[in-house]
Amino acid sequence: MGLPGAGKSSVALVLARAWDCGVVDTDDEVAQRAGVGVAELLRSHGESALRKLELDVVSDLKHRDVVVATGGGVVATLGARELLKELPTVWLDCDDEVLVARLGDEERPLLGDDWPASIKRLRVERTPWYEEVARARVDASGTVDEVAVRVAAAIDVVDT
C-alpha cells in the first residue's frame, strides 16, 4: 500500500514473478466488478462506492495466495484497515517529489489539478492509517527491482 506513484502495482508484479504466484491489483478488480474504470466509478458514483468495492475485494482476497497491490486509499475504510492488519502489509513510502514525477500524465481523479498539493494532503490524511496497518515501511525510491528486494526482505523479517 502507499500513496499514488509509490509503485504498488509495479512492485507487486515483480514480487509475484519472483515468488511464482498470482498478483491482483485492487484497482483492476474494482474496475472489473464495477464494469467501469476507477476514474469513471469515482465520477459517476463517488468515493464511497469505490471504497465499498475495495473493501469487498480485499475481503475476497484475504485467503488467496497472491500478491495484492492495493489502491492508495484503501486504508480510508475501517473494515479494510482491519483486514489489512491480518496480512503481511507493507507500506511503500518515498518523497512527494518522487511520487509526482512518477505519476506523469496518468489520470488520477482524486488528485485534481494540483498534484503536489494533493499528494501532500493525502500524505497528511493517510499516514496515520498506513502506520496503523503496515507491518513494515519500505523506502520506495529507486527502481522497481530495488524496491521489490526491500519489500521481500521486510516481509521475511516480519514473518520470522
Predicted regions and their residues:
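Short, flexible helix/strand-to-coil boundary loops that buttress conserved ligand/catalytic motifs
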Residues: A34, L42, E54, K62, ...
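ATP-dependent small-molecule kinase phosphotransfer cores
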Residues: G22-L83, P109
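A glycine- and Lys/Arg-enriched "phosphate-lid" helix/loop adjacent to the NTP-binding pocket
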Residues: E86-P128, A152
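NTP-dependent small-molecule kinase module
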Residues: S10, V14, A18, A101, ...
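Short glycine-rich anion-binding loops that position phosphate/pyrophosphate groups of nucleotides
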Residues: G72-V75, D95-E97, T143
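P-loop (Walker A) phosphate-binding loop of NTP-binding proteins
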Residues: L3
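Hydrophobic/aromatic beta-strand patches that form the interior of the parallel beta-sheet core
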Residues: V24, P88-V90, A136-V138
